[in-house]
Amino acid sequence: MDQSTLKYYSDNAAQVAERYESVVSDLSAHFADAFSKGGKILDVGCGSGRDLADLHKLGFDCYGVDPVLKFVEIAQRLHPELENRIALGKLPDLQVPFNGNFDGVLCSAVLMHIDIEQLPATATAIKSCLKVGGRLLYSVPSKRTDVVGSNRDANGRLFIPDQAVRLNSLFSSIGFTEIASWTNSDSMGRDSVEWMSVLLELQTA
C-alpha cells in the first residue's frame, strides 16, 4: 500500500476514525445479501472497525486486518466485541490471517490506494484468503473531483482512477465472476465523491 497514504492515516487516525464512526456505510446495507449467513468474513482495511461491528451484529464470524496500528487499537477500544478479531496486515503482501478459509472478503474504500503495479499481487492475496465459492465485496471511487493529476488529494493520499475497471478484469483472470455492481453516493455527504461497489464470487481455486 502507498506509504504516503499510510502515513496520513497513521498521523490522523483518531480524527479519521471519528468521521467513520459518525456515519453509516451505504455498503453495509448489502452485507446480508452479499455473504452467506453466519459465514466467516475478513474485512481488509477495517479502519475504525465500523463495518466489522456491523458484520458482527448481523451474526457473521468476522475478522479484520488493517495496516495502521493506531486503527487496530482504536477499533478494539470502540468495539470490544471484536477483541482478538483484528490484526495488523496490509496489501499486497497480506499473509493469510486467522487460519484463512474465508467465506467472504470485504474491501471498503481500500483498493484505490494500491499502485497499479501492485494490483496483481493484491488480487492474489485476496484470493488466497477465500474458499472456492467465497465472495469479495469491494468499493472504490467512481468519481473524485478533488484528486489532481498526480492522483493524490490535498492530504497526499493516493487515489488511482478507474480502479474498478482494472480490478474486475484482473479478478476475472484468476477465477472470479461478477455477481453484481452498483454506484452510490458518498455516505459522508461529499458531492465531489461517488462510489462503485462490486460483488464477485470465486469460481475456481
Which stretches of residues belong to each language-model region?
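Class I (Rossmann-like) S-adenosyl-L-methionine-dependent methyltransferase catalytic domain
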Residues: 1-38, 42, 47-98, 114-121, ...
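A conserved beta-strand element that flanks and buttresses the S-adenosyl-L-methionine
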Residues: 106
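Short catalytic micro-motifs in class I SAM-dependent methyltransferases
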Residues: 109-113
